[in-house]
From Swiss-Prot:
Function noted in UniProt: One of the primary rRNA binding proteins, this protein initially binds near the 5'-end of the 23S rRNA. It is important during the early stages of 50S assembly. It makes multiple contacts with different domains of the 23S rRNA in the assembled 50S subunit and ribosome.
GO biological process: translation
Protein name stated in the entry: Large ribosomal subunit protein uL4
The organism of origin for this protein: Clostridium perfringens (strain 13 / Type A)
Residue span of region Disordered: 44-76
Gene: rplD
């Protein structure tokens, strides 16, 4: 079983914690990670981009000049794509980019992402602030020399969220909002002991 240090928010190690091998010690499946990240980013897309083709632009129904005899290039419509204010060739239309991923693949990707972050994981005994204080959050992050950090709490914690939301490169989320992309995108994974237990309950 993987074992990592257990720390307080001052950066002092207060013990160790055994991690569940079925969640934090699996073989990393790069294919599943790729599929889930691609789907996650695709699902964020609005898909509302739209432009008009030559048939949809107003006007242009009449031939601008006769076919032959003018010395100019032949033209059929002032709304052809080569004209100013003409239609767009292969104009983009609203579409749905959503991708669905099987539940089993999502689980494999999540456990793979968690396993890949064990070396960069800081497990906190507890994480609470009496009031929203960015200074306190910065002090804690500096104690661990954390860069581009994802902080995962067991529940929604307003004081922790408000303390860290103005710090560049820091994301705070409750354990039920964790996702593969954010896990892979962080340099340091800071997670409370209670959040670890909840993850193991779901994915073990």
């Amino acid at each position: 079983m993987p074992k990592v240090g257990l720390f307080n928010k001052e950066g002092q190690q207060v013990g160790d914690i055994q991690l569940n091998e079925q969640v934090f010690g699996v073989e990393v499946n790069k294919y599943a990670l790729h599929q889930v990240v691609v789907a996650q980013l695709a699902n964020k897309r609005q898909g509302t981009q739209s432009a008009k083709t030559r048939s949809e632009v107003r006007g242009g129904g009449i031939k601008p000049w006769r076919q032959k005899g003018t010395g100019r290039a032949r033209q059929g419509s002032i709304r052809a794509p080569q004209w100013i204010k003409g239609g767009v060739v292969f104009a983009p239309k609203p579409r749905d980019y959503r991708m669905s991923i099987p539940k089993s693949m999502r689980k494999v990707a999540m456990t793979s992402a968690l396993t890949s972050k064990v070396a960069d994981m800081v497990v906190l005994e507890d994480l609470t602030f009496e009031a929203p204080k960015t200074k306190e959050a910065v002090k804690m992050l500096n104690a661990f020399e954390a860069k581009k950090t994802l902080i995962i709490t067991a529940e929604v914690n307003e004081n922790v969220y408000k303390s860290a939301r103005n710090i560049r490169g820091v994301t705070v989320m409750p354990v039920n909002n964790i996702n593969v992309y954010d896990l892979l995108n962080c340099k340091t994974l800071m997670i409370t002991k209670e959040a670890v237990n909840k993850i193991e309950e779901v994915y073990a």
